[in-house]
Amino acid sequence: MENQGWELYISTRPIFKIGKFSAVLRANFAQNINSINSMDANVLNSMNTDFNYNGGNMQILKRCQIGNALGGIYGFHFKGVYVYDYDHNGYFDPRTGKNDYYDAAGVENTAAHALAAGYEGVNIYNAAPVARDAEGKVIYDKNGNPLPMVYDYGGTNYQFGGGDVAYEDINHDGQINELDIQYLGSSSPKFNGGFGVDLTYGRWTLKTNFNFRVGNKIINLARMNSEAMRDNKNQSAAVNWRWRKNGQVTEIPRALSTQIAASYNALVSDRYVEKGDYLRFQYLQLGYSLDPKKLKKAGFSTVRFTASINNLFVWSKYTGADPDHSQSKYDPCVDNDTTPRSRSFTAGVVVGF
């Protein structure tokens, strides 16, 4: 394993000074690059968990892979939600026995035709749950019917339908299984650091500090649970936009009547992997020092009053409550509805003799 990095700290003299007023800037930046270059095969196997998704455990894989960093995230690639079910996919017309573009009622299915043909701007891979080759062409079975997409693991052979999640079939065999798992990013940030400014006017001071993190990924397990529609847990308002009928284009899969069937729409994928970039306004502190000449007569050298507001704001595109999460050992960073940092107010007095 190899670690490379650097850290830079900057603190300026007053960048400007006008009478009693002055300002000082400070900043620190750091980068740490981690990679696994080689590892004993037995040790590597002992650290990696096998793919064992039985339709109910919503398993998060813990893996170390040569060439990637510790804290890597592994799962399936989310391609969207199937717009049409298999029987409504517009490929087969039972009246003619040909692969024409008609729906079950015999009406020309122009939407399915467009999706199947791969018109510009349309994702053909989530049109209907049928297998496609590397060129995006439909794969047919020996009877001339489109090969259906299935989740195939152990004794499970679940056939995906309209409204189910479309996962990337890497090897184009029509089966979603452990062979389709891929590297989805690292929980380690590419950069992190902080900066602030200290303003002084006479005996008054105003200090600020910001910290940031860039380039890390988080598994939003809280969102996974609140959008899974698989048990009696409270659900997010996002499920109101779930798939309900053929032809509906949405990013939220359908609701299913059984927990196991619903779980295949909640496999760990980059649907739930989010950027953890953030900028936090860490604190704002106002301070005032009493006149040292007057304090000396009373036997004091220093008396200083401070008042601070901590954790004022966080700017982030992360959809969870707080993007500031840490990883442990080689595990990926997971947000399982962790209580976010609270905003606090503090006051203090520093007395010197």
Task: Tell what function each PLM region has.
Residues 20, 34-56, 215-241, 315-324:
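Outer-membrane beta-barrel and related beta-rich outer-membrane complex signature
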Residues 6, 17-18, 203-208, 293-294:
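Repeated loop/turn-to-beta-strand initiation elements of outer-membrane beta-barrel proteins
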Residues 23-25, 195, 201, 206-208, ...:
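Transmembrane beta-strands of outer-membrane beta-barrel proteins
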Residues 6, 16-183, 310:
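Conserved small-residue
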Residues 100, 108, 122-126, 132-140, ...:
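Extracytoplasmic gating/loop element in the C-terminal half of outer-membrane beta-barrel translocons
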Residues 12-14, 29-35, 201-203, 212-216, ...:
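Transmembrane beta-strands of outer-membrane beta-barrel pores
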Residues 3-7, 22, 190-194, 278-285, ...:
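Transmembrane beta-barrel architecture of outer-membrane proteins
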Residues 1-3, 51-89, 93-96, 242-248, ...:
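C-terminal beta-signal and terminal closure region of outer-membrane beta-barrel proteins
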